[in-house]
A protein has these predicted regions:
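Intrinsic disorder at enzyme termini
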Residues: 216-226
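Structured secondary-structure scaffolds
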Residues: 2-218, 237-280, 289-299
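Alpha-helical transmembrane bundle of multi-pass secondary transport proteins
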Residues: 227, 231, 235-240
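Short linear capping/connector segments at secondary-structure termini
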Residues: 224-229, 282
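Conserved, non-catalytic sequence blocks in retroelement Pol enzymes and Pol-derived host proteins
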Residues: 285
Length: 301
């Protein structure tokens, strides 16, 4: 279920030592607790009715609802199935399809942060098992917490917050995406600093230079499926590309995004650029083949 063994151990340790959960909150917003009190006979009861008119015990109308609301995580725990029509039989205005619950429960994957594993994930699993008889998702991917380059949690008071908009302005969104993917090791936090971003800025520069070199030699490159690779250099790079594609698919299927990014980085820079491009300078007949292979490489990136 959990894609990280470390997160799985933490989860089960918490469940084995679980504590009582106070579900009431004294807030002005939220789902009100469906418990009513009779002012005449002091009877207390829970009901599905939105606004009961009288006490079911003494029949008097002097009743009032509990002023507290449910903990936010109580209602959030129902999220996996409540928007899909569960509990809404006979509702006039439906915001769901007739088969949504059957088609989309359980879901295939939950992606969330580890800091709400117990607040949300565990409670969704409890509610799913209780009301639906099965867990609400098949896999759980806990993404990392992004910290500063020293491993400290970002805080305005510490002055170590990295504004993503500033990073986009300086480095571009693509560099940030690739950097975060490369650093997203399951079960570990990300230490993000300027050096990381510079590393992958250099990577994009490497790709640009390769593209520029190929374009200076040939105007257009056919799709890989439309040509036959014949040169020794082209065949070698095609074999390396095929191996990289297999590694990439295996990594993505396992939600190991850092390994996927590492495969792309290693192939594009160390194999294609450092070997393929350099050797093609002495083997001009392979330029067209490398151009087609490079198009496939960019698709992967």
């Amino acid at each position: 279920l959990f894609r990280s063994e470390r997160m799985e151990k933490i989860y089960y340790n918490w469940m084995e030592n679980i504590q009582d959960w106070c579900i009431s909150r004294q807030l002005w917003w939220g789902h009100r607790i469906p418990v009513f009190y009779c002012d005449s006979c002091n009877h207390q009861w829970a009901t599905k009715e939105d606004e009961p008119k009288m006490c079911p015990k003494c029949g008097k109308e002097h009743i009032h609802q509990d002023p507290d609301v449910l903990d936010t995580w109580f209602s959030s725990a129902l999220w996996a199935f409540s928007p899909l029509g569960w509990g809404n039989n006979g509702q006039m205005q439906k915001t769901f399809g007739e088969n949504d619950l059957k088609d989309f429960y359980p879901n295939s994957l939950l992606i969330t942060g580890f800091d709400i594993m117990f607040f949300w994930v565990a409670r969704m699993m409890m509610m799913g098992e209780h009301f639906m008889g099965q867990l609400p998702f098949k896999d759980i991917y806990m993404h990392a917490l992004v910290r500063d380059e020293h491993g400290a949690k970002m805080s305005k008071s510490k002055g170590n917050v990295i504004d993503p908009l500033d990073m986009v302005e300086t480095h571009s969104a693509d560099i940030i995406r690739f950097t975060l993917a490369y650093l997203a090791i399951q079960g570990r936090d990300i230490k993000l600093g300027e050096k990381n971003l510079e590393q992958f800025r250099n990577f994009t520069n490497k790709l640009y230079n390769a593209s520029n070199f190929l374009s200076l030699n040939v105007d257009t490159f056919p799709d890989l499926k439309d040509i036959e690779i014949k040169t020794p250099l082209g065949l070698y790079m095609q074999s390396k590309l095929s191996h990289a594609v297999d590694e990439l698919r295996n990594s993505l299927d396992s939600y190991k995004f850092n390994e996927a990014a590492s495969t792309l980085y290693r192939f594009a820079w160390m194999e294609f650029c450092d070997w393929g491009i350099e050797y093609s300078k002495a083997s001009k007949e392979s330029i067209v083949e490398l151009g087609s292979l490079f198009k496939e490489t960019l698709k992967m990136v």
